[in-house]
């Protein structure tokens, strides 16, 4: 119950923002040229929507169409500020409330087949009732709307371009990476769905099974998630040749960057990938209020090029654009591989045993709050590395760096683990450690195992969540491993222990990706 209360508090600002916007439709309709409509979605389910058209629409010509499905828990007026801006530059813009939320009918399908079919019905309606150009159709969204946009593009070749903002490529790898439940992230989604929507029996069953840690239902949960993952339909997306822009945040606690980057690398059509500091949807949130915003500016440029044919240069820029958590400038790369091209290995020498079931003090933070603090104040979660109790935390450190180290991409941990029980969970953290021993969190990731023989060593490979962070000269990097973190559900039997070793024929290490100096 405490966890759900925390989750509710974490999203309260988001819901308040949605509520404030939700009070304004009548005024907007009267003064802003917004038309509110009902659209029959899949199976006749009513979808509440609004349409904004260019001011110079005269019925003699057609305009490119952009469809905007709403975010999880947001009302249909979420995108009005951006819709008006896009309409002013010549687009027909149709925003609609996804099924199961607010005034739209039906139950929450969690980006399932009904949501995909709804998106096609919305496009059908727009082509029949607005001056939209059937040859130039785009779809964009934030969070839930982003995932639905990608799924719709895989199933509807009419979609020529997509902008996925804080979306996902692999839903399973988002909230179940390392075979570990990301419980705070799931609780946020579950709580918002309960408050602002109508959950289906299927979604309630999936969330209950997710929380319960019932391994007999694991295959069903994974299959459910794969059906809702754009990565499952990559062949269709590539065949359609949809121009896909993806933007996300380094600290996204709902849809971490790794799964988006992996999805991006497998796309073969026109594509662009952007990562910035922040948490889920926080980078693009100001744009929803009409404030200047890099994410929305690039989104409009993307559509201008691929729907209007404007030669604005976006197709000639480096397609991977990153902003470090430590600096304000952007860096360009030809692909995601190039971000991780240079690596430095830190040896995880010796043998160390830790006990489980107790939080050592090393944590990934609190969903939303921690990454927002990192975004606006450069204050990531911290830990006093010398004071971490070695009974519950294994610690390895590099030497001091004579020059600044620009960590870019995905740090990888390789080690050998000997458990005393067949199941267990560990969480690895990479810290930037200053002269006084205070560690600032650079990256982390959980790992859960089942079915191992107690007392028998096994090799473990774990990718930490991707990031861009600058370690100052004179600092060290430290890898900390413990077994409890409030972000995740742990699977350590009471009294279990984990031993980490570094065999001569298979040494343990953490491989840190560094930008070429």
Question: Which residue stretches match the model-derived regions?
Answer:
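C-terminal, loop-rich substrate-recognition/catalytic regions characterized by aromatic stacking residues
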Residues: 274, 282-283, 288-517
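N-terminal cap/lid segment of alpha/beta-hydrolase-fold proteins
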Residues: 30-61, 401
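Accessory cap/linker subdomain of secreted extracellular hydrolases
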Residues: 140-142, 151-239, 310-311
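Secretory targeting and sorting signals
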Residues: 1-29
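Short alpha-helix in the alpha/beta-hydrolase fold that links the catalytic acid
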Residues: 242, 256-264
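Gly/Ser-rich "nucleophile elbow"/oxyanion-hole loop immediately N-terminal to the catalytic nucleophile
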Residues: 55-62, 107-115, 121-143
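Short substrate-entry loop that stabilizes the transition state in hydrolases
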Residues: 57-63, 68-103, 253-256
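Short beta-strand/loop motif that positions the catalytic acidic residue
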Residues: 240, 245-248
């Amino acid at each position: 119950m405490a966890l759900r209360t925390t989750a509710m508090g974490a999203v309260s600002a988001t819901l308040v923002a949605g509520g404030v916007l939700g009070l304004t439709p009548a005024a907007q309709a009267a003064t802003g040229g917004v038309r509110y409509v009902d659209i029959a979605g899949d199976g006749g389910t009513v979808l509440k929507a609004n349409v904004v058209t260019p001011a110079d629409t005269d019925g003699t010509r057609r305009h490119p169409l952009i469809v905007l499905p709403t975010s999880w828990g947001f009302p249909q007026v979420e995108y009005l500020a951006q819709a008006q801006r896009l309409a002013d530059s010549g687009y027909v813009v149709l925003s609609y409330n996804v099924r199961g939320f607010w005034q739209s009918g039906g139950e929450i399908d969690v980006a399932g087949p009904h949501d995909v079919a709804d998106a096609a019905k919305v496009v059908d309606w727009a082509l029949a009732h607005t001056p939209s150009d059937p040859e130039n159709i785009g779809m964009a969204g934030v969070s839930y709307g982003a995932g639905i946009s990608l799924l719709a593009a895989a199933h509807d070749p009419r979609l020529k371009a997509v902008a996925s903002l804080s979306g996902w490529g692999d839903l399973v790898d988002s909230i179940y990476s390392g075979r570990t439940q990301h419980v705070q992230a799931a609780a946020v989604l579950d709580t918002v769905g309960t408050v602002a929507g109508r959950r289906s029996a299927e979604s309630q069953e999936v969330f209950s099974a997710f929380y319960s840690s019932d391994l007999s239902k694991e295959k069903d949960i994974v299959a459910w998630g794969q059906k809702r993952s754009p990565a499952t339909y990559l062949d269709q997306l590539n065949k359609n040749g949809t121009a896909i822009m993806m933007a996300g945040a380094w600290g996204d606690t709902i849809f971490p960057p790794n799964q988006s980057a992996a999805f991006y690398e497998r796309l073969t059509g026109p594509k662009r990938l952007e990562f910035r500091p922040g948490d889920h949807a926080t980078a693009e949130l100001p744009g929803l209020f009409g404030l200047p915003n890099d994410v929305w500016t690039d989104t409009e440029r993307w559509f201008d090029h691929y729907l209007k044919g404007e030669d604005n240069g976006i197709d000639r820029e480096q397609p991977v654009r990153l902003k470090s958590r430590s600096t304000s400038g952007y860096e360009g790369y030809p692909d995601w591989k190039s971000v991780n091209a240079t690596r430095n290995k830190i040896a995880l020498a010796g043998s160390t045993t830790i006990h489980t079931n107790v939080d050592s003090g090393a944590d990934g933070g609190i969903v939303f709050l921690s990454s927002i603090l990192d975004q606006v104040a450069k204050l990531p979660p911290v830990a006093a590395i010398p004071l971490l109790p070695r009974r519950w935390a294994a610690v390895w450190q590099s030497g001091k760096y004579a020059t600044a180290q620009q960590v870019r991409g995905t740090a990888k941990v390789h080690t050998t683990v000997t458990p005393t029980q067949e199941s267990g969970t560990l969480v690895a953290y990479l810290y930037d450690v200053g002269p006084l021993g205070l560690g600032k969190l650079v990256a982390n990731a959980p790992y859960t195992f089942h079915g191992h023989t107690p007392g028998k060593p096994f090799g473990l490979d774990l990718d930490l969540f991707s990031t861009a962070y600058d370690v100052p000269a004179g600092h060290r990097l430290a890898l900390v491993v413990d077994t409890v973190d409030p972000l995740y559900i742990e699977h350590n039997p009471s009294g279990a222990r984990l031993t980490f070793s570094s065999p001569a024929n298979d040494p343990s290490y953490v491989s840190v990706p560094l930008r070429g100096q």
